[in-house]
Regions:
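Structural motif
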Residues: 103-112, 170-172
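Bacterial N-terminal signal peptides that target proteins for export
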Residues: 2-12
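Solvent-exposed coil/turn segments that connect beta secondary-structure elements
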Residues: 86, 99-101, 115-117
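Primarily extracytoplasmic ectodomains and periplasmic/lumenal surface modules that are beta-strand-rich
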Residues: 90-92, 101-105, 119
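Acidic/hydrophobic-patterned starts of short beta strands in beta-sheet-rich repeat architectures
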Residues: 81-82, 88-98, 154-162
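Short consensus segments that form the blades of beta-propeller domains
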Residues: 71-73, 99-104, 162-163
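Short N-terminal edge-element motif at the start of the domain
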Residues: 63-85
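Acidic, small-residue rich beta-repeat scaffolds with periodic aromatic anchors
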Residues: 13-22, 26-55, 119-187
């Protein structure tokens, strides 16, 4: 191998090592909301019923809350979508955290969408409000849940929807007797 070729090989090797080091120290964060999360009919229903609103994405969260989400057991899920058997064991319901498309008007609302025969219906669980930081939502499994003081508890036979504001608290929404109820829970 000639001196020029050796220098070229060393140069390329150093570049590859440096590139590898940079990519290890700055991992690419993929947003779990990039993949299709809802059936097309639900997506179309939301676009028609809630123009000017979008589903909360990981990138919409404050950087500290992005880290908290990525460190949680829900890291592979979109913080603005929860899919589960919230109202019946026979079919899925779709909970979505909606925020305005206009970032200058921070707001938040929580909606659950169900397919009823050939159309969709929605229930508004949280009317538009103006939080300092957005809430995230996720599905919780059936089981026993209590408020922080252990005064009130509930046994869920269906999935629940947990709405959490990092470092503040969480509210559990659950279906009982034909409507949603809420319980403040430990986050």
């Amino acid at each position: 191998m000639h001196t020029g070729q050796k220098q070229w090989v060393i140069f390329i090797s150093m570049g590859l090592m440096l590139f590898g080091f940079v990519s290890l120290t700055h991992p690419t964060i993929t947003d779990p909301c990039d993949q299709p999360l809802l059936p097309q009919g639900v997506t179309e229903f939301l676009a028609k019923k809630f123009p000017g609103w979008k589903i909360l994405r990981l990138s919409d969260l404050h950087p500290e809350n992005q880290r908290a989400w990525l460190d949680s057991e829900h890291r592979d899920k979109c913080p603005g979508v929860a899919v589960g058997n919230f109202e019946t064991k026979e079919h899925f319901s779709y909970a979505v955290a909606l925020i305005p498309l206009d970032r200058d008007k921070p707001s938040f609302q929580l909606v659950v969408v169900n397919k009823v025969k050939e159309s969709y219906q929605h229930r508004l669980l949280v009317e538009p409000k103006y939080p300092a930081n957005y809430y995230v939502i996720y599905k919780v499994p059936p089981g026993k849940y209590s408020d922080p003081e252990r005064i009130e508890n509930v046994q869920l036979s269906l999935d629940g929807i947990q709405m959490e504001q990092f470092h503040v608290g969480a509210i559990l929404f659950y279906w009982k007797n034909g409507r949603y109820h809420r319980l403040i829970v430990d986050d």
